[in-house]
Amino acid sequence: MSFYDDQSGNLSPQRKLGRGKIEIKRIENTTNRQVTFCKRRNGLLKKAYELSVLCDAEVALIVFSTRGRLYEYANNSVKGTIERYKKACTDSPNTSSVSEANAQFYQQEASKLRQEISSIQKNNRNMMGESLGSLTVRDLKGLETKLEKGISRIRSKKNELLFAEIEYMQKKEIDLHNNNQYLRAKIAENERAQQHMNLMPGSSDYELAPPQSFDGRNYIQLNGLQPNNHYSRQDQTALQLV
């Protein structure tokens, strides 16, 4: 019986395929990972079936997908094969050796992970300009190239954000200017309407308008237009004496 979990499947670091060597590691793209899972799962089920038929072996296969969906195959019964496996492990005198082998395997995996972590930390220190003593001229040139590319991408992204911010502020300035012009036009329109209302007859402002101030020139000018009653009386007196 074989157990295979796509989340923690343990395979050799590399597998020889017809078109060359590929690195066996987790597929980051979700769609590609799902497609590969379906293909490999079907192939695994087919191999289990062929093994049970060709070799007359009792085979039970259990696969859990990333989403927790169960896929299984057994030429007899999965539960029966599992019970047989448990009984064989209990009765086997090599139970301790199996546990030791499992412990050794996990120790090796932990050691690999520690090495990967150490390598990543070293690369990070090199990127910061630290721990450069062990690097060769070729390594330093490669590191310099990586840093230049990284700085170029960072500057490009920074300029992109700055241009977007400038464009946004310019648009905001135009909007504020348009709003200011609109408000000025509305204020001028309201003032003209108010002046027009004040000049209309019958309005309270028109009736309560203050009288014009006294002007002597206007008074003399108005008297000059009136008939001279003094000379008129003298003429009348002369007519009466004759």
Curated annotation (Swiss-Prot):
InterPro entries: MADS-box/MEF2_TF, MEF2-like_N, TF_Kbox, TF_MADSbox, TF_MADSbox_sf. Keywords: Activator, DNA-binding, Nucleus, Transcription, Transcription regulation. SUPFAM superfamilies: SRF-like. This is Floral homeotic protein AGAMOUS. It is found in: Nucleus. Probable transcription factor involved in regulating genes that determines stamen and carpel development in wild-type flowers. Gene3D superfamilies: Transcription factor, MADS-box. SMART domains: MADS. One of its GO terms (molecular function) is DNA-binding transcription factor activity. Residues 19-73 form the MADS-box domain. Residues 103-193 form the K-box domain. Its main location: nucleus. GO terms for biological process: positive regulation of transcription by RNA polymerase II. The lineage of its organism: Eukaryota, Viridiplantae, Streptophyta, Embryophyta, Tracheophyta. Flower. Preferentially expressed in stamen and carpel and weakly in petal. Undetected in leaves and roots. GO terms for cellular component: nucleus. Pfam families: K-box, SRF-TF.
